[in-house]
């Protein structure tokens, strides 16, 4: 077997549809576009969301809300995820190194969810009451 003798299995590569090449091809004359109308023309189609001049649904519905800039740089971390951090000190950089949070996160709050198996020292992160109790029960401590 050589590279120049390789060929695809028979029937695995159907031939491309060639439109407008005579009535015998089955796609001659109108080329599968039907007769007349906007969609039969070259470049003739309406943009997505266009409703024929009627006020589009997107514009009929009211605007509401916004995306808080603070939420883009804030994250909540579960207690169970602290196990992924190597070492016993948990801070912003160690969470990023363990891929628990993304690099653009600046503020982290640790929440009570799951179990904490090892004693850890939490530095410079916000902690909920329940999470604080669980960390201290596991033999860890919280430093501001």
From Swiss-Prot:
Region of interest (Disordered), ranges: 1-58
Give UniProt keywords alphabetically: Ribonucleoprotein, Ribosomal protein, RNA-binding, rRNA-binding
Instruction: Name a GO molecular-function annotation.
Output: rRNA binding
GO cellular component terms given for this protein: cytosolic large ribosomal subunit
Q: What processes in GO biological process is this protein linked to?
A: translation
Instruction: Identify the coding gene.
Output: rplO
UniProt lineage: Bacteria, Pseudomonadati, Pseudomonadota, Gammaproteobacteria, Vibrionales
Q: List all membrane-crossing ranges.
A: none
Protein name per its UniProtKB record:
Large ribosomal subunit protein uL15
Function per UniProt: Binds to the 23S rRNA.
Which InterPro entries has this protein been placed in?
A: Ribosomal_uL15, Ribosomal_uL15/eL18, Ribosomal_uL15/eL18_sf, Ribosomal_uL15_bac-type, Ribosomal_uL15_CS
Compositionally biased residues, Gly residues: 21-31
Extract the NCBIfam families matched here.
Answer: rplO_bact (TIGR01071)
How is the quaternary structure described?
Part of the 50S ribosomal subunit.
- HAMAP family xref list: Ribosomal_uL15 (MF_01341)
Provide the species name. Vibrio atlanticus (strain LGP32) (Vibrio splendidus (strain Mel32))
Looking at the record's lineage, which domain of life comes first?
Bacteria
Q: Spell out the family assignment given in the record's similarity comment.
A: Belongs to the universal ribosomal protein uL15 family.
PROSITE patterns registered for this protein in UniProt:
RIBOSOMAL_L15
């Amino acid at each position: 077997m050589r590279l120049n003798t390789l060929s695809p299995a028979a029937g695995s590569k159907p031939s491309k549809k060639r439109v407008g090449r005579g009535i015998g091809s089955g796609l001659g004359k109108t080329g599968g576009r039907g007769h007349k109308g906007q969609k039969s023309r070259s470049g003739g189609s309406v943009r997505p969301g266009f409703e024929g001049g009627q006020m589009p649904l997107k514009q009929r519905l009211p605007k509401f809300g916004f995306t808080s800039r603070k939420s883009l740089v804030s994250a909540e971390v579960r207690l169970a995820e602290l196990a992924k951090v190597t070492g016993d000190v948990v801070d912003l950089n160690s969470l990023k190194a363990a891929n628990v949070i993304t690099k653009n996160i600046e503020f982290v709050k640790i929440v009570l969810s799951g179990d904490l198996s090892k004693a850890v020292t939490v530095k410079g992160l916000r902690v909920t009451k329940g999470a604080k109790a669980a960390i201290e029960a596991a033999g860890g401590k919280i430093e501001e």
